[in-house]
Amino acid sequence: MELNQVLEKKEQILQYLGTLVGLHEKALSDVNSASQVTSIRKDITICLNDLCRINDLLVSHDGLLKREIGSLLRDKQELLELNEREQLLWKERKSWHIKQETDAAPADYVIDKDAIITISSHHRTSLNKYIESVGAENTILSNTDDSDAMIEEVQNAESSADQMIRNYKLLQLSHKQAKSEIIRLETLLRDFKKDNKFIEEELKRQSGRIRSEMGNIDFHLSKIEESKHQLMKRIGFESPLTQEKSLSEKIFNLRLSSADEDYNERQTINMKNFVHMKDLIELKIEDLQEQLMRNKNESSTVLTQRELWLDCQKKVGDLESKLITKLRSSSNSKIPPNEMSEMINSTIQYLNNLLDSSDEKLTTTLISNERDVLSKACEELHSESTTAQDGSSALPSKPIDIHKSHKGSNASSNLKQPSTPSFLVASKSPPKIGISESVVNANKNDAISKKVE
C-alpha cells in the first residue's frame, strides 16, 4: 500500500471515530438505545486498534514514512550527482567550442622570422635601364603608333647600331630575369596551394573529430536530461521553464538563432530546474520528518488511549456482569440499592482514576460518558433508597438500565447506528481489525501490495 493510501485510510478512521464518540454519548443517555451500546463500544475499540496498526505501519523501522524519506534522500543524491556530471560536461563542451573566424590575428600570434620569404625583382633594373636608354615615349608605353613609318625612320636614324644592340641585350636580360623570377614565384605558389590543400583536408578531419567529441558530450547531456525528467516525474515536479515544441517550431528557431544561443538557453533552464527540484525534495523531506515525529508521538498517545479505553470497558463490563449475576441469583431478581450503589461507586472511582491519568480529549470524553451514566444511576438509587426509608411508594423517574437484554422487548431505538464503513470489519471474539497482520508483514518485506481490510 502506498503512503498516500495509508494516510487517507487513517483520516477516514479518525472521522468515523469522531462520529462514534457522539453516538456513544447518545446511546448511553437513551434507554431505548441500550442494545447499540455494545456495538458502538466494539467499533470504537476496532478504530483504536486500527490507528495503532496504521501508526506502526508508518513509523516502524521499515515504515512507509521512513521508506519515503529514504527514497527522497536517494533522489536528492541522484540529483546532485546528475547536476555535477552535467556541469562538468558543459564545461568540457565549452572547451571544445570553435569560435567564429576573424580577420584579425590572435593576440598570441608570433611572426616566425625564419619563415619569411623575400621576393626579388632583378629584372626591373635591366628594364629601367632600357627605358632610360630609349626613352619612355619611344616604347609601347607611349600612345604613339609604332606603325608610323616616319617615326620609326626617325628613331632608327637617331640610334646607332651599337646602341640598339645594347638596348636589345638589356631587354633580353630583363626578360630572362623576369622569367626566372616568375618560375620561382609559380613554384612558391604551387607550394602554397599544396600547403593550403593539406590545411583544408586537416581542417575537415579535425573539425570532424571535434564535432564527434561534442556529439558524444551532447549524447551524455541528453541522457542526463532524460534521467532528470524521470526524477521530475518521481517527485511530482513540473518545470514551468520546459515547454515541448513542435518540429516546425524547432526548425524555425534553428534557422533564426545560433546554436550557441540555443545551448546557453538550455544550460540556463537546466540550472534553474535543478535549484527548484532540490528545494522541492528538501521541503518534502522536512515535511515527512515532521510527520514522522508527529506519528511517533501519536503512536504513544493512541496506545495509551486504547489501554485506558480497554481498562474502562473491562471495569464497566465487570460491573455489568456482577449485577447480572446478582440479579439472577437473587430470589426476587432485586438487588438492595445500597449494595448496588456501592458496586457502582467503586467503578466510578476507578474511572475517575483513569481520567486523572489521561489528558487526551478522546479518552476523557469516552470515559466521562461511561462515568456520567453510572453517576446518574447512583443518584437514582440514592433517591430510591431515601424514598423507601421514608415509606414512600413513589417509583424512580426512570428504570435503572444496566444494559441487560430483555426477550420480547418491543422498544424501538430512536438512535440510528451508522453502517460499519468498509475500512472496519467487526467480528466476534476476537474482533477483526481493519489493518490485518498480513499487511504489516508484507510491509516489513517491502512488498506492501494489499489493501487495508
Swiss-Prot record:
Coiled-coil region(s): 144-213, 272-302
Keyword annotations: Autophagy, Coiled coil, Cytoplasm, Membrane, Protein transport, Transport
Domain of life: Eukaryota
Localization per Swiss-Prot or TrEMBL: Cytoplasm; Preautophagosomal structure membrane; Membrane
Membrane topology: Peripheral membrane protein
GO biological process: cytoplasm to vacuole targeting by the Cvt pathway; nucleophagy; positive regulation of macroautophagy; protein localization to phagophore assembly site
Keyword Electron transport: no
Region (Disordered): 381-428, 434-453
An annotated GO cellular component: phagophore assembly site membrane
Keyword Cytoplasm included in the entry's annotation: yes
Compositionally biased spans, kind Polar residues: 384-395, 408-422
Similarity comment: Belongs to the ATG23 family.
Additional note from the record: Present with 538 molecules/cell in log phase SD medium.
Subunit structure: Forms a complex with ATG9 and ATG27.
Function per UniProt: Required for cytoplasm to vacuole transport (Cvt) vesicle formation and efficient autophagy. Plays a role in ATG protein retrieval from the pre-autophagosomal structure (PAS) and is especially required for autophagy-dependent cycling of ATG9. Also plays a role in regulation of filamentous growth.
Protein name, entry field: Autophagy-related protein 23
Source organism (scientific name): Saccharomyces cerevisiae (strain ATCC 204508 / S288c)
